[in-house]
Each structure stands twice: as C-alpha cells, then as structure tokens.
C-alpha cells in the first residue's frame, strides 16, 4: 500500500466510522459462526496498525503479521508483543498446523496469487481451524482507493468461490456486508468516475456524518449471517479445510 494509506490508518483507525463499525460486525459474526475454543490461538495476517487486534483478543491468544515496518511497530505496541514480518504466500517462520483461527481482513486482494496465499494459510491451521476472510466486492467499483491500496482485484462471489475451491477450502457461505450504505458508495464511485474526481482520501467525514454512518453500518451486526444482504461493498466468509465442517 502507499505510505499515505498506512499514515491515514494510524491517524483514524480508532475514530473512523468504517473501522469502528466493522470491528463490531466481525466480533458478532465470529461469536455466532466461529465455534472457537476458549483458549483459541489466533493469527492476524496483514494486521496494519493493529486496529483489529483488541477485538480478536476477546476470542483467544493473538499473534500478528505485518510487512510494513512503521505499521508493524504501532501494531506491536497495541498487541504488547512483537509482530512478525512474514509475507504471503511464503509465511516464513510461521508455525504450521498451529492456529484455531487466521484472520485476513481486506488482505487477500493485495496478493497476486490469492490461491497460493489461501493454501499457505490453510497449512497453518490446526485440524478444524478456520480462516476469517473479508474482501472488497464488485469489479465495477474499482477506484483510486483500490490503486493506492495496491489491490490486484475486487471480488465477485463467483471469483472468490473459485479461489476458495482451488485452494482446497470450503466456505460457510459468502455474505455481503456494508450493504445499507451501498447505494451511497455506488453513487460516489460512479460520480467520481464520471467527473474525474475519483478521490482516494478515506479520512473521516465531518463528525455528524461519521456518527451517522457508524450507526447505520454497525446495525449490520444484527444482520450479517442471519439475513441475506445484497449487494454490499465487501464480502465476509469463514473457511475451513474441504474435508471438515465449516461450522
């Protein structure tokens, strides 16, 4: 990702509506769908500045990987332990067969060979372990935001399902989320393309709008995995080995 993306993440990940609401949505989703043991060993790959680590720590003992040095330092402070530098798909130095949960939250789209990355993660799971995946949805929503984040792709459900299957994994279901605000996001992307003002700035909006968007997005914690949401800006799923249960 461009340096400015990490800088904005560090500045805004505790206040921006998207980060705050998404953490709550994913926490509820894991509580309902994860089936994790109480002493779960968890690895977040591509943790950025570590804004998801406290949420994941509610489910077990957390370790983390981040390849950007400055972000890794911030994440280590939040985690209270060193954060590894182990790029996908090689994951050098990462123990195989060791984790109950691996979280890759808006990470897989950054990896050129997504199938190899998913296979590498699967090799690090304990029997019955799971991979929590979120990715950006809809190729037609490609924008300057994807460019500065060094995305290789945005996914459809079909392309994500193919990558999952090719990696020898199975999904508990591909669910759209960030759906209630999808019309606004879609209009913004199309308008930006038509006017030539395709802005990559993801700083928080004015406080009133930031609170409003957070409230609307957070409401999806009651819906994701329970009520079909379509379409959405993102897709979430839990993966497990093809021969095991995805629940």
Predicted regions: what they are:
Residues 169-179:
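Conserved S-adenosyl-L-methionine
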Residues 115-130:
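A short glycine-rich, Lys/Arg-flanked "PGG" loop and its adjoining helix->strand segment in the class I
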Residues 1-97, 101-105, 115-118, 207, ...:
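Conserved N-terminal segment of class I S-adenosyl-L-methionine
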Residues 15, 181-247:
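A C-terminal cap/extension of S-adenosyl-L-methionine-dependent methyltransferases
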Residues 110, 114:
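Di-metal (Zn2+ and/or Mg2+/Mn2+) metal-binding site signature of metallo-dependent hydrolases
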Residues 10-11, 131-153, 157-165:
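Short, glycine-/aromatic-enriched active-site segment of Class I SAM-dependent methyltransferases
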Residues 105-108, 134:
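Residues lining the SAM
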